[in-house]
């Protein structure tokens, strides 16, 4: 591959590429040049009002935490992570951060939509959880059992490559209580995703090896080296994940021998190089990036420029804009079709979602007298767009499903 093509391809592994290329699809929507979606900007205020109301209801103090996996460990007035990690209190802040990153990575990878019929009965608390919260608590219980540790119950709160490679769908099904009456979307693909993570950790030694161990948590040591004047740029977290874990995604795309991950194609994005038409989203990688910020901050990192990361192109955020009629589908028969996540329609939907989240963030800050420091996009997603999308979905559809039918394998959405 020519050097220019290599550079252009690697540039796709940045948050700037996500934002720029999604904007190009949005510009086509502004001139009504998209094949599947129409932009109804006159209805945009409805989405803004929904999110403002959601933030006020969820966080009346105005102090909104980041949208991250850690929120799903906080339920019913309890912090399940703090309860599970009490044995780590004697460890250094560095080792605590490694353990948190271990958990965040595997839990995010297991977080794609569970489906409407699955739930997790947590025997320890006596509580039952579904969807993202259920997947979070189930993954935490599996983590603290030592199933991901090569040292087993002797040192359970860690994730090692060899244990990930040994994980089977049967183990996952048992721990996640999957049965014919409690089906989980994409069970086998979730197990394969963790198997692939184990393989990738061993390949990417420069990022994930430390003292003879291969752990997601060793990303902490890699990011230590990326600090400049005591601060870490948020984009460095995403770039490290994309470059280090690019081979994990089974649905990910490649350009020659470079894994470019969660991307689609659209004719509105024009380039005179090998990346012509490519639209990157990196949804799970950015969700993972948001979920690593707090462990890094707790370990003493100063993380700058959070808003370089983009909003997440997933079905709750995207559903908010369809259900608020900010965007509409030109052909209503598309609501009856099950759509592949790489389909042109879904690519348009996801690209519009990224840009509309940026525009919504501007309006939220304007109306709450905040700025990108006091109300970063990560907090607006939490406050926020994701829960507003889920709320309106339940108001409009009995099972809270997204407005579009999706062929989810449990690896992206």
Where do the model's predicted regions map?
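Extended, well-ordered protein cores
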Residues: 2-299, 306-333, 337, 344-413
């Amino acid at each position: 591959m020519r050097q220019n093509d290599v550079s252009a391809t690697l540039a796709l592994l940045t948050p700037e590429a996500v934002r720029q290329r999604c904007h190009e699809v949005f510009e086509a929507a502004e001139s009504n040049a998209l094949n599947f979606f129409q932009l109804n900007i006159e209805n945009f205020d409805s989405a803004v009002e929904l999110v403002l109301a959601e933030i006020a209801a969820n966080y009346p103090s105005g102090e909104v935490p980041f949208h991250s996996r850690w929120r799903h460990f906080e339920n019913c007035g309890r912090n399940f992570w703090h309860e599970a990690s009490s044995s780590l209190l004697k460890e250094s802040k560095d080792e605590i951060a490694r353990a948190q990153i271990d958990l965040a990575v595997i839990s995010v990878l297991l977080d794609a939509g569970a489906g409407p019929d699955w739930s997790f009965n947590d025997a320890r608390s006596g509580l039952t959880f579904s969807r993202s919260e259920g997947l979070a608590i189930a993954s935490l219980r599996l983590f603290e059992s030592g199933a991901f540790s090569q040292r087993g119950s002797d040192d359970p709160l860690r994730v090692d490559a060899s244990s990930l490679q040994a994980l089977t769908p049967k183990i996952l099904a048992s721990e996640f209580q999957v049965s014919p009456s409690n089906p989980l979307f994409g069970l086998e693909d979730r197990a394969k995703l963790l198997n692939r993570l184990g393989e990738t950790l061993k390949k990417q030694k420069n990022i994930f090896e430390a003292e003879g161990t291969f752990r997601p948590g060793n990303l902490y040591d890699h990011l230590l080296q990326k600090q400049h004047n005591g601060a870490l740029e948020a984009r460095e977290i995403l770039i490290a994940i994309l470059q280090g874990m690019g081979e994990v995604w089974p649905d990910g795309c490649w350009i020659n021998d470079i894994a470019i991950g969660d991307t689609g194609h659209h004719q509105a994005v024009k380039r005179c190089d090998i990346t012509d038409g490519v639209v990157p989203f990196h949804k799970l990688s950015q969700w993972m990036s948001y979920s690593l910020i707090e462990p890094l901050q707790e370990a003493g990192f100063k993380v700058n420029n959070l808003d370089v990361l983009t909003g997440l192109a997933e079905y709750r955020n995207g559903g908010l804009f369809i259900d608020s009629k900010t965007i509409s589908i030109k052909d209503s028969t598309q609501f009856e079709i099950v759509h592949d996540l790489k389909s042109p329609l879904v690519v348009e939907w996801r690209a519009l979602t990224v840009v509309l989240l940026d525009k919504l963030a501007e309006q939220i800050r304007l109306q709450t007298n905040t700025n990108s420091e006091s109300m970063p996009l990560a907090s607006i997603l939490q406050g926020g767009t994701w829960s507003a999308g889920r709320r309106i979905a339940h108001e409009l559809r009995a099972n809270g499903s997204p407005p579009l039918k999706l062929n989810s394998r449990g690896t992206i959405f």
